[in-house]
Amino acid sequence: MVYSYTEKKRIRKDFGKRPQVLDIPYLLSIQLDSFTKFIEQDPEGQYGLEAAFRSVFPIQSYNGNSKLEYVSYNLREPEFDVKECQIRGVTYSAPLRVKLRLVVYDKDAPAGTVKDIKEQEVYMGEIPLMTDNGTFVINGTERVIVSQLHRSPGVFFDSDKGKTHSSGKVLYNARVIPYRGSWLDFEFDPKDNLFVRIDRRRKLPATIILRALRKTTEEILDLFFDKVVFEVKDQTLMMELLPERLRGETATFDIESNGKVYVEAGRRITARHIRQLTKDEVNNIEVPVDYIVGKVASHDYVNEDTGEIIIAANQEFSLEDLANLSQAGHKKIEVLFTNDLDHGAYISDTLRADSTVDRLSALVEVYRMMRPGEPPTKEAAESLFESLFFSEDRYDLSTVGRMKFNSSIGRDNGEGAGILDETDIIEVMRKLIDIRNGKGEVDDIDHLGNRRIRSVGEMAENQFRVGLVRVERAVRERLSLGDLDAIMPQDLINAKPISAAVKEFFGSSQLSQFMDQNNPLSEVTHKRRISALGPGGLTRERAGFEVRDVHATHYGRLCPIETPEGPNIGLINSLSAYARCNEYGFLETPYRRVVDNIVTEDVDYLSAIEEGTFVIAQANAVLTEEGTFADELIIARQKGESGLHPREHIQYMDVATNQVVSVAASLIPFLEHDDANRALMGANMQRQAVPTLRADKPLVGTGIERCVAIDSGVTAVAKRGGMVQSVDASRIVIKVNEEELVPGEAGIDIYNLTKYTRSNQNTCINQRPTVLPGEPVTRGDVLADGPSTDLGELALGQNMRIAFMPWNGYNFEDSILVSERVVQEDRFTTIHIQELSCVARDTKLGSEEITADIPNVGEAALSKLDESGIVYIGAEVKGGDILVGKVTPKGETQLTPEEKLLRAIFGEKASDVKDSSLRVPNSVSGTIIDVQVFTRDGVEKDKRALEIEQMQLKEAKKDITEEFQILEGGLLARVRTLLTLAGTSEVKLDAMDRKQWLEITLDDESQQNQLEQLAEQYDELKAEFDKKFETKRRKITQGDDLAPGVLKIVKVYLAVKRRIQPGDKMAGRHGNKGVISKINPVEDMPYDEKGQPVDIVLNPLGVPSRMNIGQILEVHMGLAAKGVGDKLNQMLKEQQELHKFRNFLQKVYDLGETRQEVDIAALSDDEVRTLVKNLRGGLPIATPIFDGAPESSIKELLKLVDLPESGQLKLFDGRTGDAFERPVTVGYMYMLKLNHLVDDKMHARSTGSYSLVTQQPLGGKAQFGGQRFGEMEVWALEAYGAAYTLQEMLTVKSDDVNGRTKMYKNIVDGDHRMEPGMPESFNVLLKEIRSLGINIELEDEE
């Protein structure tokens, strides 16, 4: 395997055995691809904005004299970049301009004569843009649009499984679901009549729809039934016979032909009888005359002479009818073929229940059902029915829906119209009847072939279309009313409804969520989340077990492990590592193709439907060298069932062992040894890990840490290879390799790093360079680590030395005992950044002012403010300190303009202003790291704002100048090379000013041309940078667009350092969570024979019942990994030669039969030194899930570094020095500190706010609430008979208003008595009883 320069710095030992056929695809592609599809111009008009415009335009006026056509659209550049939007609190969006054409027809000339055409670009609101990392910045905060899993449009056949009717009879139904439009349901009732519902309204006989489609009774019967023909001969009836139709019937008469009796009367007709009849080619048999009684006529039989109908279609025959028919001379009689087994008379019965006779009555019936109470007219009824399923404006199946519809009813082609036609409706009814007759299966609604993903782009497009449709109505009216000669397209379009619809979707849709930004993994997982909730989806309350359950088709598409615990379980899923969406929105997963028993490297992506019938082997099937299966029988899956299949039958094989699970679950080493419930907790808790001060890579990982860190976008990744030219804390400059240059560019890439920024969860985002000047980098190398990444690998926690043993009850019930050393070394110290803002508004009584001149505040309180009244950067503040001084005018009377003027001149302020400064919240203390001041346009900036502005300008200038100098240097270096080639001496060049080089003329024409080109580039570069600086200057100095009534906003950023302390929640990666019970001095912790104390003591009882054995294996493996580091340190101490290090490392990397090949000999001496330096803390190990290190490899590695193979060490008690009775499992586990910190939860109150109605204290920290003394607590005091304590609890300490104020007063006066009165909640109870009409009066006891 080839390692890049930065990967060589720390090579992770991989224990995986299966070859890697396919790299994990880019993790955020589901978001980025979908949104790109939305905003990129699609010439076909199938997707995105283009599709939305084409579906609404052209808009015709009502009178047909004019129309507005759509030509094209373009998105301009956004005004601010992403970072500026976040700072200013605005949306990162681009203005949408649409070219429209207004065509006016001449009404006097012949139809279609054009009188005038006007084209114009019209502004149609702002479209929020996606950042490179798949998020949106809406009002300054990063949000994610979660993809939705919804029922695919199409037709679904289902049954009630016998639950509806008391008899337990299974009732079948069919439902046609369009992408937009009315739902059409067909259903059977217990009497086997077929009914139709539109939009879940009341049901009508299904034949009404057919009548409305201009079908007569005869045509309807013709569509659904086969015929049986009888011939009348004298006194007998001959019946045409198809033997197959007799199966399962009981003969009511002897079935004979040519004197041979085939079936005797009363016998059941079997398959043997049918074979005999077929063999003898019996086509006609004689039947008794009464056999026809009760059969149904297939069409009207008319008396030719009189014209009267003898028997109408769908009427049952009687003997009398038969006589009349033979009298009228009808010799052939056709009846419907029905039986109870597999040809039910459902449609025939339904027709009898159907009261309508012709199309009009059917349309009226539909109209009455859809619009009850409105008088139906013929036109209204017709237009309503047409618009339901046959109008492209109101109904659309979509391409997916049509494809699913056609495949459901058995058509071959996947194309067709977006609307229904009569054949579609008839086919659906036919298929439903077939299913009722026992042919065909009902659909499985939870199959992933019937559920599709709706991603950002599609949802945004739908929302945009909603806005356009609102505009369409207004445009129509304006076109019909306005003066068309004077009107321009601009005057017709009002962009407000469009931007309102888009804004509403991005700002407040259920699927637009505040991004979970705890750490890189939580970001990635949030963007890959698939929710079944949301508009058009399920609701928590209605979703049953089946929807939430893991389905066989989830394999490789949705993760069976990662889903929230609680009410949303199974409704919110995560995309599996390799899954992707196909063009129809169905999830696909990759498989290796098997051709002629050989497993090839070719990969096919299959959707759940395509996968259906294939036999698919698992990724861990054993293969020979040639790529054939080693075993005769292979464990494989077919139609969702696992079983043993002969190797010749296998058609596909899984791509990777982790293709079943999501990214978060793939990060858990030894996942295969954990119980699923705990794995679920482990996967979910990794997302809550807080980035620590110094990230520490996991010693035991799974090998995909690098992939997650890079794809998450928190690291700076090289776009092109080259040489690192300069590095400082905030920027990295790379000189690009010659071969990767675009002709005519300077060849310098500049990466600006993010420093100490606040995340959505108030954690700290900070990037640190990992490269040094002069180092070579290749494309895709990590240049700077972000939060929770270490040398480009995801690092959510810290490797801690752990012992599994009880310790004086301090690890009872999952508590965790931690050594003081962990606190001293700041292993779990985290930085949290809070944003506090102060807003100065314009009030009725005058404007608020930000100032250091605050009434009745001492000097000490103002010591940290500057003259503008804003705290200075670097100040250490604690709860209650003033951050921004602000005064608000308080006035009992509103001032007259004259008084206002006098006040303005003489500045009498102090008397009538109150202090409304921004103070630090009570429980917070920290350091001010940044201040931002936003001033409204037209309001004078204060001194601090100007200082900040100057500083920003200076920084921007420095940035742009440096960037220019670097690029200029690169360009001039090329000029110098050119000049020296042309023979100019270097001494002469050095004597000149560098810019004069461009003015030199050369003899050689081609060289002169090159020089001129470079000179031109130089001028362009200079002009570009001047323009860049001017733009930046304008952005910095212009006023800010603030909300109405806001004059000034000051944002103060406060950094808080949180050390680990008792009450904080910690967890491993295997769902083993606990709360810190005590920080123990190092000297009291258990230590081993070398005197090395452990960092954390965990309870061994937390393992067996939870069945997450992965943590034990991780601890053993961690011990071995650390052992390698210790061994290297020992060798360094002994100052051994380099070749011994090489040999030892080679031995380590060669251990076990793995796919990884590391050739230490190929590394240079410096590279080996760097590698050893980075491995001193321990050898990082990858054990991929389901393909991890076996027990033997762990033992082998432990043996190699001279540690006991049991993984257990002899420990001594730190307090007494005595050895513990038996060896203890000691090793290294990767521990996370979760974002459930005791500082955020602890809260105290003596008095505070009360609820309005009950007058009881509120609950919770956010409301500054008290503790609730609930029902059970009252019982406890009752049980003890503590009457006075109870009385105090229920009155003066809770909701006895007078009692509690009196008590407060008494305490102030030093009098410690209390007089309980009437609790307010009792008054509330009285009021509630009175509201029920029962009067209650309280009697005073005299």
UniProtKB/Swiss-Prot annotation:
Gene3D superfamilies: 2.40.50.100, 2.40.50.150, 3.90.1100.10, 6.10.140.1670, DNA-directed RNA polymerase, beta subunit, external 1 domain, DNA-directed RNA polymerase, subunit 2, domain 6, RNA polymerase alpha subunit dimerisation domain, RNA polymerase Rpb2, domain 2. InterPro entries: DNA-dir_RNA_pol_bsu_ext_1_sf (IPR042107), DNA-dir_RNA_pol_bsu_external_1 (IPR019462), DNA-dir_RNA_pol_su2 (IPR015712), DNA-dir_RNAP_su2_dom (IPR007120), DNA-dir_RNAP_su2_hyb_sf (IPR037033), RNA_pol_bsu_bac (IPR010243), RNA_pol_bsu_CS (IPR007121), RNA_pol_bsu_protrusion (IPR007644). GO terms for biological process: DNA-templated transcription. It comes from the Bacteria. Its EC number is 2.7.7.6. The keyword Metal-binding does not apply. The keyword Ribonucleoprotein does not apply. Keywords: DNA-directed RNA polymerase, Nucleotidyltransferase, Transcription, Transferase. It catalyses: RNA(n) + a ribonucleoside 5'-triphosphate = RNA(n+1) + diphosphate. One of its GO terms (cellular component) is DNA-directed RNA polymerase complex. One of its GO terms (molecular function) is DNA binding. DNA-dependent RNA polymerase catalyzes the transcription of DNA into RNA using the four ribonucleoside triphosphates as substrates. The RNAP catalytic core consists of 2 alpha, 1 beta, 1 beta' and 1 omega subunit. When a sigma factor is associated with the core the holoenzyme is formed, which can initiate transcription. HAMAP family: RNApol_bact_RpoB. This is DNA-directed RNA polymerase subunit beta. It comes from Aliivibrio salmonicida (strain LFI1238). The gene is rpoB.
